[in-house]
């Protein structure tokens, strides 16, 4: 039996992470040490919103998830934010939503 994950296994793992955590950010690096500017900006926006229950997933440590997350939401870039199981978007969308107050509303509800 191979230890390789099938694409279906990867999608199930992603689905569990998204559904079992209120706020999930798939990013490059960690909240403490982001490995790209976009991921760093995403973490800062969430901190500015007062998010304390942020679950991050470092896609650089898992190539299968790094590719699989792009298929999961049909979104080509990382970071990707999910709130209450719903795909929100990447760092640009997060910034726009933050500036308009929509992100704070989504996180508060």
Tell me the role of every PLM-derived stretch.
Residues 1-15:
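Flexible, polar/low-complexity N-terminal or interdomain linker segments that lie immediately upstream
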Residues 15-53:
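Local sequence-structure signature of Cys/Sec-based thiol-disulfide redox active-site neighborhoods
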Residues 51-66:
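Thiol-based oxidoreductase modules, predominantly thioredoxin-like and allied folds used
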Residues 71-77:
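Thiol/disulfide oxidoreductase modules built on the thioredoxin-like
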Residues 83-109:
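Non-catalytic, surface beta->alpha helical segment in thiol-disulfide oxidoreductase systems
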